[in-house]
């Protein structure tokens, strides 16, 4: 049987390695399942899937080099990059090479500007808007924001959040805007300023490494405040030794491993068995779903031609781990967001009244 090769680039080493490893492992499980079930039927031919994954260390220049390596190896589609900066770094390259690009986890709005690029995860604007609407709906009268102004993801979510407060006529809810930069671990100065405002809730659009430090320091400084996070908080439980510092934290996510659905629990069981009892995160789930989306696109197109694949991407609907997935004409996903709350060291569904 011939092979369709999925080319992927993401961090397997460096500070963001956990994201790339999750994406690689989620894809490997999906590919194994698909191949065991007979592969991908494209027209009247069946193909096995294979994954070629290159390490980009979440670095834009290294992402371009990794992409070049993938093209030299004659991959059929690109599933990447993992991070927003690296995804943006290769979009014009994939456009010039006329190859379909699907990022499982790059959330910056500009990534899907080219018609050959799609994304599986939520966009930054959707996250910011959804979390602002949550805060308004829950009746909080004051909110502080602590975001990473050196990171495109964090800044993008923050800006969309602020814009939604303005557009809904609630700008007065935002009583403090504090920032930090990547690799910061001491947030005392920012949190002390926030404490002085008596904000009832802090919104932290950030990845889980910084999020863990912030949550602990909120407790250490005695802030009596709720915390809400973006999807970058997924995995934060693995960053703390005392999970009680995270009790009550709410964050937006497309996936959580304690979801009781049969589909999710089967995936979690397989993932743990294959990867030394590791618990899958949303990056693994988005990647798993991305492989099934690509399978559906090839089968809908009936050909490996890029133009036909692009058309097929806007016509398919896939029942994934992260929900029912389809795509709009701009390449962004249409699927439902979920909120989870951390309680007693576990992720639980957050009911939104």
Mark where each language-model region is.
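Extracytoplasmic "Venus flytrap"
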Residues: 7-28, 54-60, 83-85, 146-155, ...
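Beta-alpha junction/loop-to-helix N-cap segments that form part of ligand/metal-binding clefts
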Residues: 19-22, 40-111, 120, 180-184, ...
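Signal peptide-proximal N-terminal region
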Residues: 4, 25-51, 166-172
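An alpha-beta-alpha
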Residues: 117-178, 201, 294
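Extracellular/periplasmic bilobed ligand-binding domains
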Residues: 157-252
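Segments of small-molecule ligand-sensing domains
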Residues: 273-284, 295-346
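Extracellular/periplasmic periplasmic-binding protein-like sensory domains
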Residues: 215-288, 341-353
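Periplasmic-binding protein-like
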Residues: 70-82, 102-104, 144-147, 198-208, ...
